Amino acid sequence: MLFWTAFSMALSLRLALARSSIERGSTASDPQGDLLFLLDSSASVSHYEFSRVREFVGQLVATMSFGPGALRASLVHVGSQPHTEFTFDQYSSGQAIQDAIRVAPQRMGDTNTGLALAYAKEQLFAEEAGARPGVPKVLVWVTDGGSSDPVGPPMQELKDLGVTIFIVSTGRGNLLELLAAASAPAEKHLHFVDVDDLPIIARELRGSITDAMQPQQLHASEVLSSGFRLSWPPLLTADSGYYVLELVPSGKLATTRRQQLPGNATSWTWTDLDPDTDYEVSLLPESNVHLLRPQHVRVRTLQEEAGPERIVISHARPRSLRVSWAPALGPDSALGYHVQLGPLQGGSLERVEVPAGQNSTTVQGLTPCTTYLVTVTAAFRSGRQRALSAKACTASGARTRAPQSMRPEAGPREP
């Protein structure tokens, strides 16, 4: 009797441990990751605005959990040269981080955001800056909307490395540029708000940051028309097992793609996919040491990136032109359009931004009886652009010309 009692207890203990291992592999844990704040500290920001931004960032981190096994934070200033206020491993408590933010001085200088983003990329992955391998990376850029140098290429490099980008703009800025820079979807990762109203978005943004830091979820990012990036937490090590990734187009089991990855992998990018298609993705951890459940996510690729194919000029007046184009792309396909007019003989450029879903605009402030090169550029979430150009001439009098389909000067191009 004693033998069966001991055997029953041992069996119950083994079953309990197995259940515990499975549950530990599939339930949520505390957020863990490296959080970098990139603040516009240049002379384009007033001292009052900078003080309000500091208060806002302090409010964001107030209820977050910081420590070696939780979140870590760093602050980098945008100026003529990037400057680190504190590194990821400099402070281990939320209160110490708040105190450091509260006394951070404004650096002034030019707004070289592109330079600061390249610097931030190094900081996010440098162990000497306290960054940790294999944890989620989040960058929060607070800006007045302007930059003295390009931000698109360094932002894309960060996103290609799996960094989640949140942008808070307290000024007007370039809408299309900011939409392309932020992680998708834009409604979750991009905020336009007056500097005095920053506290209004603090709770929502804090929740979004925390969601991005959750380590237990397989998730997709950088979704394009031909592929997307998958990321997951470090569930295994190189010595404890491996992963199998499965990719199944909706309703097409026969075309399942599989990829085996080492146990220390935390990301993979699928390419050569079909546009506007649903894919079921499964991450299967294989290990003799840990019992971990598969993780699943559904991802839909974007529609194909097709730029304008025809430009129509109408209502040609001495100081204005109406520009139309086809096809018209909706918000699901493009971020929007740039319409630019420049005199062929040289002179100032006129530029208009048009939201996705519209395919015409009237450009004002032109010179009478002048030939212009009209360029319509479609901007996509991938950061790519496609453009088409045509010639147009303003009228010498007040007479309106009938619409004419213009022969393109150049085929669709990708700047």
Curated annotation (Swiss-Prot):
Subunit structure and binding partners: Homodimer or homomultimer; disulfide-linked. Interacts with HSPG2.
UniProt domain VWFA: residue ranges: 34-209
InterPro entries in the cross-refs: ECM_Assembly_Org (IPR050525), FN3_dom (IPR003961), FN3_sf (IPR036116), Ig-like_fold (IPR013783), VWF_A (IPR002035), vWFA_dom_sf (IPR036465)
Glycosylation: residue positions: 264
GO MF annotations in UniProt: identical protein binding; microfibril binding; protein homodimerization activity
Record-level GO cellular component terms: basement membrane; collagen-containing extracellular matrix; extracellular matrix; extracellular region; interstitial matrix
Full protein name: von Willebrand factor A domain-containing protein 1
Main function: Promotes matrix assembly. Involved in the organization of skeletal muscles and in the formation of neuromuscular junctions.
Disulfide feature: 369-393
Signal sequence segment: 1-18
Region entry Disordered, spans: 391-415
Residue ranges of every copy of the Fibronectin type-III domain listed in the record: 214-305, 307-403
Compartment(s) where it occurs, according to its Swiss-Prot or TrEMBL record: Secreted, Extracellular space, Extracellular matrix, Basement membrane
PTM (free text): N-glycosylated.
Keyword flag Phosphoprotein: yes
Protein's organism: Mus musculus (Mouse)
GO BP, one annotated term: protein homooligomerization
Keywords: Basement membrane, Disulfide bond, Extracellular matrix, Glycoprotein, Phosphoprotein, Repeat, Secreted, Signal
Entries under Pfam families matching the protein: fn3, VWA
Expression across tissues: Expressed at high levels in the chondrocytes. Detected in the vasculature of neural tissues, in basement membrane structures of the peripheral nervous system, in the apical ectodermal ridge of developing limb buds, and in skeletal and cardiac muscle (at protein level).
Residues recorded as bearing Phosphoserine in the entry: 74, 80, 93
Domain of life: Eukaryota
